[in-house]
């Protein structure tokens, strides 16, 4: 079967408007296309909705690290595991603003603030809202990931100037119970709905390499693509090994071609969403990242650290994008830098 012979019935084809009724068989058909056909379809749709030679650059800061009561089996910040990550208090406003300013000057267009909470307390949310407003004044897009939200909390974040709320589903509904027991998948879906109803854009994706099967990876994409509205940002994370967490017993970094196929299927199923090549890039070769961009990834995190794990150095990212002829805010930062 080649790309031209793919048929999904009901009048659907790969040139249709975004859909919300993807089936398992359709997802499997896409994933199993010959590699060249899959990449061709993904790149064709990518060009229809995005500049194929531009990548979004975001920066992620942990404003409150560790001590999280959730038992996510991959996470170094869970209080359930002896990962070596020390719990910290919520950062001061001025420290967050200064970090955001440096991120902007280094080439970030979006600044994401993460706190290791099950859900924010109102007194802490007051402080986060103040941070959001201040970061927004720097000319950056704002994103936050703070755990579960009530409808009122989502509205408060929106009113403070927050653009995006991140709350990942992590994996398929079927595999979910193998990695998390303290928060249900429905809890996550409810928080996404609260964010959407408050007027926030949604950032939602997952992790591959936790010990799941290909069917689980596709199930995660189906869950996202069949939401009432597609997430505006879809981060695809690759498992990062951290000390003393349960998934280390079964997790394995995915085959590189499998990662590219996931990116391509995400691009096809959610053609207007930004697909972020997220955690795990420090393990990827330049060639693998180039294939992911070709398959439809168009966002990365810049900065040497992602929460508690490493990330490629910004200079390496800038050099790679330059070699590929891909533009980003890193170009503006380079042009503005004083000569040596």
Curated annotation (Swiss-Prot):
Binding site for [4Fe-4S] cluster: 68, 72, 75
PANTHER family recorded: BIOTIN SYNTHASE (PTHR22976), BIOTIN SYNTHASE, MITOCHONDRIAL (PTHR22976:SF2)
Record field: catalytic activity: (4R,5S)-dethiobiotin + (sulfur carrier)-SH + 2 reduced [2Fe-2S]-[ferredoxin] + 2 S-adenosyl-L-methionine = (sulfur carrier)-H + biotin + 2 5'-deoxyadenosine + 2 L-methionine + 2 oxidized [2Fe-2S]-[ferredoxin]
Keywords: 2Fe-2S, 4Fe-4S, Biotin biosynthesis, Iron, Iron-sulfur, Metal-binding, S-adenosyl-L-methionine, Transferase
Protein known as: Biotin synthase
One annotated GO molecular function: 2 iron, 2 sulfur cluster binding
Region (Disordered): 1-21
Cofactor(s) listed: [4Fe-4S] cluster; [2Fe-2S] cluster
Free-text remark on how the cofactor is bound: Binds 1 [4Fe-4S] cluster. The cluster is coordinated with 3 cysteines and an exchangeable S-adenosyl-L-methionine.
Enzyme class at the top of the EC tree: transferase
Species of origin: Nitrobacter hamburgensis (strain DSM 10229 / NCIMB 13809 / X14)
Radical SAM core domain location: 53-272
Assembly mode: Homodimer.
InterPro entries, A to Z: Aldolase_TIM (IPR013785), BATS_dom (IPR010722), Biotin_synth/BioAB (IPR002684), Biotin_synthase (IPR024177), Elp3/MiaA/NifB-like_rSAM (IPR006638), rSAM (IPR007197)
4Fe-4S listed as a keyword: yes
Gene name linked to the record: bioB
GO terms classed as biological process: biotin biosynthetic process
Binding site for [2Fe-2S] cluster: 112, 143, 203, 276
NCBIfam families referenced in this protein's UniProt entry, alphabetically: bioB
Enzyme Commission number(s) of this protein: 2.8.1.6
Function per UniProt: Catalyzes the conversion of dethiobiotin (DTB) to biotin by the insertion of a sulfur atom into dethiobiotin via a radical-based mechanism.
The family this protein is said to belong to: Belongs to the radical SAM superfamily. Biotin synthase family.
Keyword check for Protein transport: no
Pathway the protein takes part in: Cofactor biosynthesis; biotin biosynthesis; biotin from 7,8-diaminononanoate: step 2/2
